[in-house]
Amino acid sequence: MRPTAQNIRAMLSACLWVTVVLLAGVAPVAAVPRENHEEKEANLKQQATGGLFHKWTFDKEATKSIPGGFVPLSSGAGVSGIWSIEHDETAPSAPNVVMGTSVCEESTCFRLLIAQGLEYEYPDLTMRIRSADGVAGVGGFVFALRDAQNFYAVLVDLGAKRAQVIRVIEGVTTVLGQTAVTLKPIDWHSLRVQRNTIVSKDFIEAFVDGVLALSVEDQMLGTGQVGVVMQGKTTWFFDTLHAVPLFSHRPLSSPAAY
């Protein structure tokens, strides 16, 4: 006996129902394991013990050398970036700055300079930045870094006058937010990045020249290292880096159930 159209529809509906049930029982797998509540509380206590309040002006460093306490990393193909202490009397904290140069043409190239031995869950980061010609280039802060393939970054494109928050997981970049920014008519611009939390939501805020530019929610990555970053082909200058933990905004216990 040939199956009727009604029987065929019934069989297809049954198959679809079984597929939905099976898929519903499969939990999504994150590329990077997330912290549970106990791990977050332990990290908070560690953040509050001190030792994470740092300011770098680089003025006592020897020129033509990599800044002490920092290590270069590279994400993406191509030649590694070049980092060195240079003399610059125009710097906000003269005479020394950090200069970074990347010759990689691809936007997937990230050249990182990471502070060693320091990990933050909710960092408050500030610094002053400028590009070689004052108008072109992309650079900013990197944080929550686990390795060269897993991190957050806040980037400022001085030529396009744009700010971005990105997440890199296993080398794959996701833009979490971007917006146009108004830059002040000055040589050295300011960049501030805060990672904060309200109840169970983590969010990232970026301030350019003192103005809030972006606020995005994401909690894929947890505690990690911090540093500076360049994207693509550029030469950037960095000065007066501050890094402190924003632990005072972190709840000490789980929120009440209402």
Where are these regions (language model features)?
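Bacterial N-terminal signal peptides
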Residues: 13-25
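Extracellular carbohydrate-recognition regions
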Residues: 34-76, 249-258
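Extracellular beta-strand elements of beta-rich domains used
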Residues: 58, 239-243
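Carbohydrate-binding surfaces in secreted/extracellular proteins
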Residues: 58, 127, 189-215
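Extracellular glycan-recognition surfaces and repeat-rich motifs
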Residues: 62-98, 109
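Secretory/extracellular carbohydrate-interaction modules
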Residues: 101-165
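Short, aromatic/His-centered strand-loop micro-motif at the edge of beta-sheets
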Residues: 169-190
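Flexible glycan-contacting loops in extracellular carbohydrate-active proteins
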Residues: 215-239
